[in-house]
């Protein structure tokens, strides 16, 4: 789950 959240944030940034 953590890696998925990081991916989402990275996409926004």
UniProtKB/Swiss-Prot annotation:
Antibacterial activity against the Gram-negative bacterium E.coli and the Gram-positive bacterium S.aureus. The keyword Transmembrane does not apply. The modification Leucine amide is found at residue 13. GO terms for cellular component: extracellular region. Its main location: secreted. Keywords: Amidation, Amphibian defense peptide, Antibiotic, Antimicrobial, Secreted. It is found in: Secreted. The keyword Secreted applies. One of its GO terms (biological process) is antibiotic metabolic process. This is Temporin-1Ja. Belongs to the frog skin active peptide (FSAP) family. Temporin subfamily. Transmembrane segments: none annotated.
């Amino acid at each position: 789950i953590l890696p998925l959240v990081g991916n989402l944030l990275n996409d926004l940034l």
